[in-house]
Design a protein with these regions (language model features):
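Phosphate/pyrophosphate-binding catalytic cores of soluble transferases and nucleic-acid-acting enzymes
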Residues: 1-300
Length: 300
């Protein structure tokens, strides 16, 4: 079985430096696993790696779609598996913090059906009580975990049953993995106070580098479609550009939302017990790279 390495962790933890050093040691290519860095032109606000920082290491799935294009976990899963399956002899690092994307490759995608327009139109005609009753009828287990007023999730439970005849709660546990790779999963962390300080500092640097100008230019081209991407750093700055909040408030909100996002990322990766964790406040980057290199070669 072929093998690859995952380098995951929360935003701002320091994945880039370690991934570049490790890729150099292993003569590996890097597959960006970041849901925002696929978009062209979104550079400063996504802390996108620069050509200089790449140090000649080949990177995949950066700057591949326009901000008006839809790019989903399904697109990512297909793109990554194509790269892996066409180059089984190469070493690859999946590097990023979008857990759902990484999981789609390492553990496979759910076999749940895609949304169906006609079914959604029908369900939209039902009142909340009727929808809740249908959801309970078709899948009581899943429905018990959903707030009675959460129409989006209730509609999905009913939709899945109508389309497949099977329960959402059962299908959602079944995945299809479309590659023959085994993944060495590495996650990076720091002490929380230090991580949050790094995040705050990085946001300040983004503003110094010209975040507002970057987003002004993008907003002129893409308008509200840019806002609909719902990417931290961009929505808050667009609110500032539109006069809804001050620049200081935008800065504050980006820091706050980034810290909250880091916490969610940490929780996501901790839930997967296959990850081996390294604390960058306790172990040097060089030691971590050396250890990962050894683990990869021992188990290769």
């Amino acid at each position: 079985m072929n093998r690859a390495i995952v380098i995951a962790g929360p935003t701002g933890v320091g994945k880039t430096k370690i991934s570049i050093d490790l890729a150099s040691e292993l003569n590996a290519e890097i597959i960006s696993s970041d849901s925002a860095q696929v978009y062209k032109g979104l550079n400063i606000g996504t802390a996108k790696i620069t050509e200089k920082e790449m140090q000649g290491i080949k990177h995949h799935l950066i700057d591949i779609v326009e901000p008006i294009s839809k790019y989903s976990v399904g697109n990512f899963e297909k793109d990554v598996n194509k790269i892996l399956n066409q180059n089984p002899e190469k070493n690859f690092l999946l590097v990023g913090g979008t857990g759902l994307y990484i999981n789609s490759v390492t553990n496979g995608l759910s076999i749940l059906p895609e949304a169906d327009k006609k079914t959604r139109e029908y369900l939209s005609t039902l009142n909340n009580q009727a929808l809740l009753e249908l959801a309970l009828k078709y899948d009581e287990e899943a429905t018990k975990e959903i707030h009675p007023n959460n129409r989006v999730r209730l509609e999905r439970v009913v939709e899945v049953f109508l389309l497949t005849g099977q329960k959402f709660s059962e299908l959602s546990k079944k995945n299809i993995k479309n590659n023959n790779f085994k993944f060495l999963k590495i996650a990076l962390e720091r002490d929380r106070e230090n991580l949050y300080n790094r995040i705050n500092k990085r946001v300040d640097i983004m503003f110094e580098q010209g975040l507002v100008d970057e987003i002004k230019n993008l907003y002129k081209i893409y308008g509200e479609k840019l806002y609909k991407l719902n990417i931290i750093g961009y929505n808050e700055t667009i609110d500032y550009i539109n006069g809804k909040i001050s620049l200081d408030e935008a800065n504050y909100r980006i820091k706050l939302n980034s810290r909250h996002y880091a916490k969610r990322q940490f929780t996501w990766f901790k839930a997967d017990k296959e990850y081996q964790w390294f604390n960058l406040d306790e172990v040097s980057e060089q030691e971590i790279v050396k250890t990962i290199y050894t683990l990869f070669n021992i188990k290769a």
